């Protein structure tokens, strides 16, 4: 049962509406009572991205069909940010985040690499293009990111070795197969594992040694023989 005195974070099994974060952050009180409507909205938004009429932030058409390949909805308590940095994407607090890539089948050396989630090249390229459309929110986000780019980079460099060590140890005991991305967020002195996905479907994979990467087989059709 949800406590309407608390804030919550919501997503589908594959999509969180991060770029419009206000829809992913459900605030205590009335919004908690209406949480189902927020879930329906981001689920609908993910489905719409699979439409042939879909366009990205730059106006380019393209069907993104992998965003909503799940019926799962996720609700967890919101982690109140301790960071003093400002927000982008309509309410997403900028904090130190690290993306680790692991091979769950390699128990001896599972860590494939660790990268800064707020990658400067990716962020500036994306926000610069969106800003060209004249979107004032994009101008705001681009300006804020540029102001704190070095701060985020230094936070990443100061924590990546410790996080890499912890994730390496964790990966040795995971009951999983295949290669995965694992996202870790720093909040004050605490670190949270906040998301995982198949490595092959994850951004920033191009920064990992391609010789260590392998495709994961996805079972799109359920195996019903076990019920016979």
Describe the function of each predicted region.
Residues 1-97, 101-111, 115-168:
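Active-site nucleotide/adenylate-binding loops and adjacent lid/helix of ATP-dependent enzymes
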Residues 10, 182, 194:
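Active-site flanking residues adjacent to catalytic metal/cofactor-binding acidic residues
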Residues 97-98, 180-182:
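Short loop/turn microsegments at loop-to-beta-strand junctions
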Residues 101, 183-186:
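Conserved protein-kinase catalytic-loop segment immediately C-terminal to the catalytic Asp
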Residues 154-165, 172-178, 186-228:
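C-terminal active-site "lid" helix and adjoining low-complexity regulatory extension at the edge
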């Amino acid at each position: 049962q949800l406590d309407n005195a608390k804030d919550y974070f919501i997503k589908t099994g594959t999509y969180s509406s991060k770029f419009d974060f206000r829809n992913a952050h459900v605030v205590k009180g009335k919004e908690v009572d209406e949480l189902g409507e927020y879930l329906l909205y981001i689920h609908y938004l993910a489905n719409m991205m699979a439409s042939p009429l879909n366009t990205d932030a730059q106006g380019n058409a393209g069907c993104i069909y992998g965003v909503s390949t799940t019926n799962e909805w996720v609700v967890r308590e919101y982690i109140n940010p301790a960071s003093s940095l400002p927000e982008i994407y309509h309410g997403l607090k900028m904090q130190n985040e690290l993306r680790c890539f692991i091979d769950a089948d390699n128990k001896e050396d599972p860590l494939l690499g660790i990268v800064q989630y707020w990658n400067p090249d990716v962020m500036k390229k994306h926000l610069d293009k969106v800003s060209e459309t004249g979107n004032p929110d994009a101008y705001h986000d681009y300006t804020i990111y540029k102001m704190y780019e070095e701060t985020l980079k230094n936070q990443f460099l100061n924590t990546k070795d410790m996080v890499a060590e912890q994730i390496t140890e964790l990966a040795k005991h995971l009951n999983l197969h295949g290669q995965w991305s694992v996202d870790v967020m720093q909040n004050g002195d605490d670190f949270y594992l906040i998301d995982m996905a198949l490595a092959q479907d994850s951004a920033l994979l191009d920064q990992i040694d391609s010789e260590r990467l392998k495709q994961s087989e996805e079972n799109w059709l359920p195996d019903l023989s076990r019920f016979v």
